[in-house]
Regions:
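Solvent-exposed interaction patches of small proteins and small membrane subunits
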Residues: 1-66
Length: 66
């Protein structure tokens, strides 16, 4: 498995864990601001995943076709 794929999977697993944590926070009726902060942290990880995927696409699919 490529290093990029391993990093993407690691980030996605982290986001999955955060989403599971969010579900528990909602079930436990946690403070809304804490939930919001966790949502923002999850969004940040998903943005990193998107950047990694687009970067890999540029390197693999776009630049190699020149």
């Amino acid at each position: 498995m490529k290093a990029e794929q391993q990093n993407i999977k690691r980030l996605l697993n982290t986001a999955k864990g955060q989403i599971d944590g969010l579900n528990k926070m909602i079930d436990d009726d946690k403070y809304c601001i804490d939930i919001s902060n966790q949502i923002m942290a999850t969004i940040a990880i998903l943005k990193k995943v998107n950047i990694e995927i687009l970067d890999a696409h540029l390197k693999c699919c776009v630049l190699s076709r020149r």
